[in-house]
């Protein structure tokens, strides 16, 4: 690349950083944002239903479970840096132990994760973490970085005429938009614990949650779907240790184990049937029809 082009790219990056920064509503720090709040809300609203449908759809067998999860989520959301976002919380009929947040406060948690949790405090740890991603505009920040990379791709294409540059930059854009960074995950852990403690929950539940995710990430028998899961929420020993240190400084709170076990009773009753179904699907994909039918 020519020196002039490199200087132009550098200048654009600096200019974008200056004009595209905003104050993080949760931390009070400056962060990149080329996406307006209105655009962010629109993206979340437009993608919420399609995202649900592509991941098993809403869990409708026990409507009271959705209400239970939403009540806890809304309580935590009111304590966030953006309490007036149009938050929604839904349970998805999906075996993968995952939860996610779209821009604008559109949050989902899978049936497969609810099965692994032991009490309401652990559920609050999950939902508090996702609320931070939404309130801190992490999704908007990811989209902004993707926009800069896409612009860089276009500039490189025009300057070089070489599609290889486009492919490399395109992969980078996809990777950034599909994965929260280390700082964003630590931020969501830290402030998520704040929210759950303010709501009266035991912060050690957040430690237990990360220990569970770390154990799953190290279990090679679980297959590639776990690699895809942890691409968006990468667990680490660092996160476990930071959560431990933070929880040790905070007051103990409620666990609400009995209430949680009661709320999740139906999915626990049905868990063996779901496991059988998933095994059958796996065998069918291998065209092992006899195994799929047993």
Predicted features, each with a name:
Residues 2-294:
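A Zn2+-metalloprotease active-site environment signal
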């Amino acid at each position: 690349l020519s020196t002039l082009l490199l200087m132009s790219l550098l200048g654009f990056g600096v200019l974008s950083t200056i004009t595209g920064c905003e104050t993080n509503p949760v931390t009070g720090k400056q962060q990149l944002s080329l996406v307006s709040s209105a655009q962010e809300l629109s993206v979340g609203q437009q993608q919420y239903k399609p995202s649900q449908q592509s991941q098993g759809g809403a869990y409708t067998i026990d409507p009271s479970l959705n209400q239970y999860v939403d009540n806890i989520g809304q309580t935590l959301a009111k304590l966030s840096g953006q309490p007036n976002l149009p938050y929604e919380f839904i349970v998805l009929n999906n075996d993968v132990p995952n939860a996610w947040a779209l821009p604008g406060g559109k949050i989902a948690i899978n049936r497969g994760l609810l099965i692994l949790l032991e009490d309401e405090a652990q559920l609050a740890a999950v939902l508090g973490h996702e609320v931070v991603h939404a309130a801190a505009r992490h999704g908007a920040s990811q989209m902004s970085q993707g926009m800069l990379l896409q612009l860089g791709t276009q500039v490189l294409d025009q300057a070089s005429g070489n599609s290889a540059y486009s492919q490399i930059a395109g992969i980078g854009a996809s990777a950034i938009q599909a994965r929260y960074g280390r700082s964003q995950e630590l931020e969501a852990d830290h402030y998520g614990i704040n929210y759950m403690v303010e709501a009266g929950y035991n912060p050690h539940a957040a430690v237990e949650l990360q220990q569970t995710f770390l154990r799953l990430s190290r279990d090679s028998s679980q297959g590639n779907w776990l690699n895809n899961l942890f691409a968006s929420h990468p667990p680490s020993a660092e996160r476990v240790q930071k959560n431990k240190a933070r929880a040790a400084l905070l007051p103990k709170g409620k666990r609400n184990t009995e209430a949680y076990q009661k709320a999740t009773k139906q999915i626990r009753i049905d868990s063996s049937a779901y496991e059988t179904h998933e095994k059958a699907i796996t065998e069918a994909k291998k065209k092992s029809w006899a195994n799929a039918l047993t």
